[in-house]
């Protein structure tokens, strides 16, 4: 089961990815986490990435693609994975397709979580995560079962992203619609796209995604 979740900031991709990980036992592959791990491990591609980052430059698509490729070869990805934050552009999508094909693999599905722009500001400004394990929560829609205690690891320390505020929502949406939303048409043309209504409550969104996954 090899998946990509698409949707604007605040659509609930992180929450749903977390639930897929817990239910199906496949890893969620975050480009940021993979970059840091490759640099820490001192792999060849990690050294290339470190040199670029130390110079204060953005890591190129070819380096990110190489790190994703390296990560997918790890044993815990044998049953599948969820790509988180990659691909973001059509160029990256083409590179991902070519990389998977070279390994004899293909994407199982690309799931688009559709949410109206009008509600995204409320969703984004209310988000926070466990500082220890990264579990996601929301002031209104997804509070811990015990107030102030993480459901997953029991930590009492939480944090909010600096850019999770109303002022940056418009800018982040503009970037999404310019760079990432073209992927919806790209994967639709390949017969991989599945859409779910992200305006529903979290449990209904999860159920709709599971209905899609059950047919893969």
From Swiss-Prot:
Annotated ATP binding sites: 10-15, 127, 200
InterPro entries: Adenyl_kin_sub, Adenylat/UMP-CMP_kin, Adenylat_kinase_CS, Adenylate_kinase_lid-dom, P-loop_NTPase
Positions with a binding annotation for AMP: 31, 36, 57-59, 85-88, 92, 160, 172
GO cellular component terms, A-Z: cytoplasm
An annotated Gene Ontology molecular function: zinc ion binding
Residues annotated as binding Zn(2+): 130, 133, 150, 153
Main function: Catalyzes the reversible transfer of the terminal phosphate group between ATP and AMP. Plays an important role in cellular energy homeostasis and in adenine nucleotide metabolism.
Domain comment, as recorded: Consists of three domains, a large central CORE domain and two small peripheral domains, NMPbind and LID, which undergo movements during catalysis. The LID domain closes over the site of phosphoryl transfer upon ATP binding. Assembling and dissambling the active center during each catalytic cycle provides an effective means to prevent ATP hydrolysis. Some bacteria have evolved a zinc-coordinating structure that stabilizes the LID domain.
Designated name of the protein: Adenylate kinase
Organism from which the protein derives: Rhizobium rhizogenes (strain K84 / ATCC BAA-868) (Agrobacterium radiobacter)
Lineage of source species: Bacteria, Pseudomonadati, Pseudomonadota, Alphaproteobacteria, Hyphomicrobiales
